[in-house]
Curated annotation (Swiss-Prot):
Membrane topology: Multi-pass membrane protein
InterPro entries: Cell_synth_A, Glyco_trans_2-like, Glycosyltr_2/OpgH_subfam, Nucleotide-diphossugar_trans, PilZ_domain
Domain PilZ span(s) in chain numbering: 694-790
Pathway: Glycan metabolism; bacterial cellulose biosynthesis
E.C. code: 2.4.1.12
Broad EC category: transferase
Subcellular location: Cell inner membrane
UniProt-annotated stretches for the region Catalytic subdomain B: 441-501
Gene that specifies this protein: bcsA
GO biological process per UniProt: cellulose biosynthetic process; UDP-alpha-D-glucose metabolic process
UniProt keyword list: c-di-GMP, Cell inner membrane, Cell membrane, Cellulose biosynthesis, Glycosyltransferase, Membrane, Transferase, Transmembrane, Transmembrane helix
Names of the cofactor(s): Mg(2+)
Family label: Belongs to the glycosyltransferase 2 family.
Protein's UniProt name: Cellulose synthase catalytic subunit [UDP-forming]
Native organism: Salmonella typhimurium (strain LT2 / SGSC1412 / ATCC 700720)
Length: 874
């Protein structure tokens, strides 16, 4: 390069060009790219007057106007990138100038939109105020009960007839489109309206569209002339029918959540009943169990009416010694049949309380647990069971591996936040094995905890309901525990739940037998159907491959009609679920959860349907560590297989697009879009299988709690506790931190009007942020510390309202990012031979993306970018 430039150019220009070449090389450009960059520079100086002030201003704004082009490290096709970006800048600049006045009119539309939203937000309250006088009046009050029931029956009958006509009426494409526009317009009108009316209206609209879709699928979309297409189409129709049934049952289940509130206890404590607290354990570490016992000892309940029992199925001497030391009862079985259910039933022979509260050994109850739950038992004598949420202060594998802890609702939030509350409306609340209180008399009547299935909790509540007893659910978290530490343990737990619910379906089917109301039967049925999602989910993940690989028409209809039926069905269901479930499950996350579990719950549920007695009980491990970040290749193997299968479908789809019949082009495009969506979801499943490092034995809990620290010299400083664990705390001193690392200080915390002192040592000081490690505590101090932290009545209730509002489009974008993240992890942890393929694909995608124009960075707005571009056009 140097010799050639000296031969062709005068010395000053040659030296300048050589200096530029060396600069390119220092910034990482290859010799070819550096030489080509110099050549493009020469041509640019020849063609354009780059020394002119106008061009100098453009060059000064290079980073803002051309953010994706590195001028210090040229690439061979940079001129093409400059050309595309310049045309883009000219286009958006002229568009902005042309449409600037119109935005003022759009501001008026925005103002009208804001007023409409305000009007809709206040509509329910205005209607309530206008109709208050009607609450005491009954339009049909002069009629007998029989006449009123007859009129209601006539109304329901005519409504069903109209609904049937609406669902089954065939439309041509234009009529179907207009019908959908009307429904969509109504949905957009009511979706922002607060209160339950809007949710009910959205459910009606969603059911209308979905029922029309399923009717159309059964009557118009099966190819009876092609056996392969017929078989594949029936398989997909089976999965869609399952999804439709779950959708309908789900709407019924949560249509009117009860939101039960506590009932005050009698002021006279002598009327309070006796309670036994059971803490069953098998192979958990003693440190996991201690906090639960310490919290139980501090529950606000008369000590002579409270007995705490450690039910140790491991028969460990350390647990016996601990129980004796803290003053609680200890029971160890000589035989271990029926696992946890047998352990509890054995303890029932020894305990004599009127009620029994059950906590898993890692679930730490709050001090208010019994005061919040027991009032309902005294009010309703037929109430047999009160369930509270299972709240977790540690992230589950989805939250930890994806970095979403306390950013999006976790997998269980929907069940404990909405579904159980909806069940409560229909008197169908399930016993969940922990964080619950059961009345002894009904429990003894059914022979104790059910032992016939591995989900003894749900089966027990089913038996109680069959006996005519009621159940209740209170959505306020009154205990918190440890989530599963690894994805494999999480999947193992879900396998047990799935198999157990299917066992109940086979052995004690809620649809049959006496004692249950129709609503209870439907709620139990939906719970069992939920765990049968494995096979339908796998069908959805592979369905488009039937056409791409086998040329089978799984939906035998024109692409236009498919779009007019499928898209509204999905959009209305998503919109309705976002309205109903938004606080508890963000849009599209169910796809990730079900995909991760599908492969693993499909075989055991299928086996349980055939042979419900096959299989064994497994205990979910808690409190483990993940020493290093790694991909669980065993768990992720099915996802990778499905990814490869879908990539094969992409290749087949590309071939069909270019070489297949022209009349199938739209069908190929629709199938490829479906495949790409499946690949995104599978990428998310792969991302979950990358186990993040977890080296803390004691999980930190975020909180905002006032406190104080006292130095040994007597100086006192107020502070705010922002996190705590079983071994230490993080605090923020209100003012300048006047403590040193290694210094011993006392931490002062309040519970009610009582103040407690805990010895600590400073282990970290960063500004006014201080890390404290607890010094060895006495048993009394440890109990007090748990009472001031884990067992505070308000610790967990504040977490429920901390999640952001669900926005379906933003949630979809999160899922897309998550899918790409999964493939990036595959490239990161793959064997060297596979890494080459991933790196090549990544490089190819990055090269293609580098040509896409970008919006100018914000710095360009500081300079008059429109004027600069106008100068470039001159």
């Amino acid at each position: 390069m140097s010799a050639l430039s000296r031969w062709l150019l005068i010395p000053p220009v040659s030296a300048r060009l050589s200096e530029r070449y060396q600069g390119y090389r220092r910034h990482g450009a290859s010799p070819f790219s550096a030489a080509l960059g110099c050549l493009w520079t020469i041509l640019a100086w020849i063609v354009f007057p780059l020394e002119h002030p106008r061009w100098q201003r453009i060059r000064d704004g290079h980073k803002a106007l051309y953010p994706h082009i590195n001028a210090a490290r040229p690439r061979p096709l940079d001129p093409a990138r400059y050309l595309i970006q310049t045309l883009w800048l000219v286009m958006i600049s002229s568009t902005k100038e042309r449409h600037e006045p119109r935005w003022r009119s759009f501001a008026r539309l925005k103002d009208v939109r804001g007023r409409y939203h305000q009007w809709m937000d206040t509509l329910p309250e205005r209607v309530r105020q206008k109709t208050t006088h009607l609450e005491k009046e009954k339009e049909l009050g002069h009629l007998s009960n029989g006449a009123r029931r007859f009129i209601l029956g006539v109304i329901v009958t005519f409504s069903l007839i109209l609904a049937l006509i609406c669902i089954t009426q065939p439309f041509n494409p234009l009529s179907q489109f207009i019908f959908l526009l009307l429904l969509w317009g109504v949905a957009l009108l009511v979706r922002r309206m607060p209160g339950r009316f809007s949710a009910l209206m959205l459910i009606v609209l969603s059911l209308t569209v979905s029922c029309r879709y399923i009717w159309w699928r059964y009557t118009s979309t099966l190819n009876w002339d092609d056996p392969v297409s017929l078989v594949c189409g029936l398989i997909l129709l089976f999965a869609e029918t399952y999804a439709w049934i779950v959708l309908v049952l789900g709407y019924f289940q949560v249509v009117w959540p009860l939101n039960r509130q506590p009932v005050p206890l009698p002021k006279e404590m002598s009327q309070w009943p006796t309670v036994d607290i059971f803490v069953p354990t098998y192979n958990e570490d003693l440190n996991v169990v201690k906090n639960t016992i310490y919290a139980s000892l501090g529950i606000d309940w008369p000590k002579d009416k409270l007995n705490i029992w450690i039910l140790d199925d491991g028969g460990r001497e350390s647990f016996r010694h601990f129980a004796r030391h803290v003053g609680v009862h200890y029971i160890a079985r000589t035989t271990h049949e029926h696992a946890k259910a047998g352990n509890i039933n054995n303890a029932l022979k020894h305990a004599k309380g009127e009620f029994v509260a059950i906590f898993d050994c890692d679930h730490v109850p709050t001090r208010s647990f019994l005061q919040m739950t027991m009032g309902w038992f005294l009010k309703e004598k037929q109430l047999a069971m009160m369930q509270t949420p299972h709240h977790f202060f540690s992230p589950d594998p989805f939250e930890r591996n994806l970095g979403r802890f306390r950013k999006t609702p976790n997998e269980g939030t929907l069940f404990y936040g909405l579904v159980q509350d909806g069940n409560d409306m229909w008197d169908a609340t399930f016993f969940c094995g922990s964080c619950a209180v059961i009345r002894r008399k009904p429990l003894d009547e059914i022979g104790g905890i059910a032992v016939e299935t591995v989900t003894e909790d749900a089966h027990t509540s089913l038996r109680l309901h069959r006996r005519g007893y009621t159940s209740a659910y209170m959505r306020i978290p009154q205990a918190a525990g440890l989530a599963t530490e690894s994805l494999s343990a999480h999947i193992g737990q879900r396998i047990r739940w799935a198999r157990g619910m299917v066992q109940i379906f086979r052995l004690d089917n809620p649809l049959f037998g006496k004692g249950l109301k129709l609503a209870q039967r439907l709620c139990y049925l939906n719970a069992m159907f939920h765990f049968l999602s494995g096979i339908p989910r796998l069908i959805f993940l592979t369905a488009p491959l039937a056409f791409l690989l086998l040329h089978a028409y799984i939906i035998y209809a024109p692409a236009l009609m498919i779009a007019l039926f499928v898209i509204p069905h999905m959009v209305h269901a998503s919109l309705t679920n976002s309205k109903i479930q938004g606080k508890y499950r963000h849009s599209f996350w169910s796809e990730i959860y079900e995909t991760v579990l599908a492969w693993y719950i499909a075989p055991p549920t299928l086996v349980a349907l055939i042979n419900p007695h096959k299989g064994k009980f497994n205990v979910t491990a808690k409190g483990g560590l993940v020493e290093e970040k790694y991909v669980d290749w065993v768990i992720s193997r099915p996802y990778i297989f499905l990814v490869l299968l879908n990539l094969l479908g992409v290749a087949a789809g590309v071939w069909r697009y270019y070489y297949g019949p022209e009349n199938e082009t739209l069908t190929v495009i629709v199938s490829l879009v479906w495949v790409f969506y499946n690949l995104v979801i599978l990428g998310g499943a792969v991302a979950v299988s990358v186990e993040s490092k977890q080296v803390r034995r004691a999980h930190r809990v975020e909180i905002a709690m006032p406190g104080a620290i006292a130095r040994e010299d007597g100086h006192l400083f107020s502070c705010t506790v922002h996190d705590f664990s079983d071994g230490g705390l993080g605090i923020k001193i209100n003012g300048q931190a006047q403590v040193l690392e290694g210094q011993k200080v006392n931490l002062l915390l309040k519970r009610g009007q009582q103040e407690y002192v805990f010895p600590t040592q400073v282990v970290r000081v960063t500004g006014n942020e201080v890390g404290l490690q607890l010094m060895p505590l006495t048993t009394k101090q440890h109990i007090d510390f748990v009472q001031c932290t884990f067992a505070r009545a308000d610790t967990w209730a504040l977490w429920q309202d901390s999640f952001p509002e669900d926005k379906p489009l933003e949630s979809l974008l999160d899922i897309l990012k998550l899918g790409f993240r999964g493939y990036r992890h595959l490239a990161e942890f793959a064997p060297p031979s596979v890494k080459v393929i991933f790196r090549s694909l990544t490089a190819l995608i990055a090269w293609i993306v580098s040509f896409i124009p970008r919006r100018p960075e914000r710095q360009a707005a500081i300079q008059p970018s429109d004027r600069v571009m106008a100068q470039a056009q001159q």
